From Swiss-Prot:
Its main location: cytoplasm. It comes from the Bacteria. One of its GO terms (molecular function) is ATP binding. Keywords: ATP-binding, Cytoplasm, DNA damage, DNA repair, DNA replication, DNA-binding, Nucleotide-binding, SOS response. ATP binds at residues 30-37. It is found in: Cytoplasm. Coiled coil: none annotated. One of its GO terms (cellular component) is cytoplasm. This is DNA replication and repair protein RecF.
């Protein structure tokens, strides 16, 4: 799989850009602030329908414009698939696949598979649980696009339940138990589906991350991944879905008084974490700076290998990564990604350690092939 053409209209700093991309290595060179990361952000948006840099779509639209438009041409399994996304903040995206309009995100998500590693990814190891939850969910929807709807349904159920709890907390009124039971059941069903998907993913992903860490670190240190939930483990391990739902409902009842007082949901996937261990200790507190970089790289490379094992090799993106790594890790990283069908790299300078391939110069949101 590779992206053969990318077009941007009014996306971030770009009024208009159109570029042809090769399979293999494509390197975008330019000083900071010239628009390199905006290019790869557009590629990620075509894959996941969300930015890896911002939680909302408004910053994606060029200042003074009403909408941003992305077009990508993907070559996969010997056929070309055209993807079109129109981003209008505050409204649903307009999506087209091969010229046909669709309202369903899952019809587009997963066609272009992308794994990106960026300096912000140090937060996967050092940061809050939200970054690790987003990491898991992004891999989930690329691996199994139908789970885009599962995640969206959970987020909707969480918003609705929180709105109900907030209204009770603010008004100080007697809670309507029948209404609470309805919201609890809706939430528990959505939570059970997402929890099951995440736990299965961690089980599949862990061996790939362990192998990637060994390659990046030169065999120094052993890593372990574990999904930590606010729902009791014995509930999550049950094979029967209805039993898991009942267990989540029981967990909600235990914290009901606190939830009603605070006006928010205290149990569920939105409060879970991916526990990262290095040599049997929490990586967040014990890993050195270099070890943390190796761990973050291993998480991305593990996701890449898992997706590749599923039959389609993702596009690998390295966004200003080489500047963050020492020479040894640069060499090891280059070795790990050398087999990628397409590799997109951004860099402020054309580093000697960068792989050989097509070079582009990016300056003031203009892109041209280097001489």
């Amino acid at each position: 799989m590779y992206l053969s053409r990318l077009e941007l209209t009014d996306f971030r700093s770009y009024r208009r850009a159109a570029l042809e991309l090769d399979p293999g290595v494509n390197v975008f060179v330019g000083s900071n602030g010239q628009g390199k990361t905006n290019l790869v952000e557009a590629v990620c948006y075509l894959a996941l329908l969300r930015s890896h840099r911002t939680a909302t779509d408004a910053p994606l639209v060029r200042q003074g414009s009403e909408r941003a438009v992305l077009h990508g041409e993907v070559l996969t399994s010997g056929r070309r698939i055209d993807l079109d996304v129109e981003i209008v903040p505050g409204r649903a995206n307009r999506l087209r696949v091969n010229g046909h309009a669709t309202r369903r995100a899952r019809d587009l998500v997963g066609i272009l598979r992308v794994v990106i590693f960026a300096p912000e990814d140090l937060a996967l190891v050092k940061g809050d649980p939200a970054a690790r939850r987003d990491y898991l969910d992004d891999v989930l929807v690329e691996l199994r696009p139908r789970l885009f709807a599962v995640r969206a349904e959970y987020e909707k159920a969480l918003r609705q339940r929180n709105a109900f709890l907030r209204a009770v907390a603010q008004d100080g009124q007697q809670v309507d138990r029948n209404s609470l039971d309805v919201w609890n059941l809706h939430f528990a069903r959505a939570a059970a589906a997402l929890l099951d998907a995440r736990r299965r993913l961690v089980h599949e992903l862990a061996p790939f991350v362990e192998k990637a860490y060994a390659a990046i670190s030169g065999g120094s240190g052993a890593v372990r991944l574990e999904y930590r939930s606010t729902v009791p483990e014995e509930v999550l391990q049950d094979a029967d879905e209805e039993t898991r739902i009942a267990g989540i409902l029981a967990a909600l009842r235990k914290v009901q008084d606190a939830e009603l007082a605070r006006g928010l949901t205290l149990v569920g996937p939105h409060r879970d974490d991916l526990n990262l261990e290095l040599d049997s200790r929490p990586a967040r507190g014990y890993a050195s700076h270099g070890e943390s970089w190796s761990y973050a790289l291993a998480l991305r490379l593990g996701a890449y290998e898992l997706l590749r094992s599923d039959g389609e090799t993702p596009v690998m993106i390295l966004d200003d990564v080489y500047a963050e790594l020492d020479q040894q890790r640069r060499r090891r990283l280059t070795g790990c990604v050398s087999g990628a069908e397409q590799l997109l790299i951004t860099s402020a300078v054309d580093e000697p350690d960068l792989p050989v391939g097509r070079r582009y110069v990016v300056h003031e949101s203009q892109v041209h092939v280097a001489d």
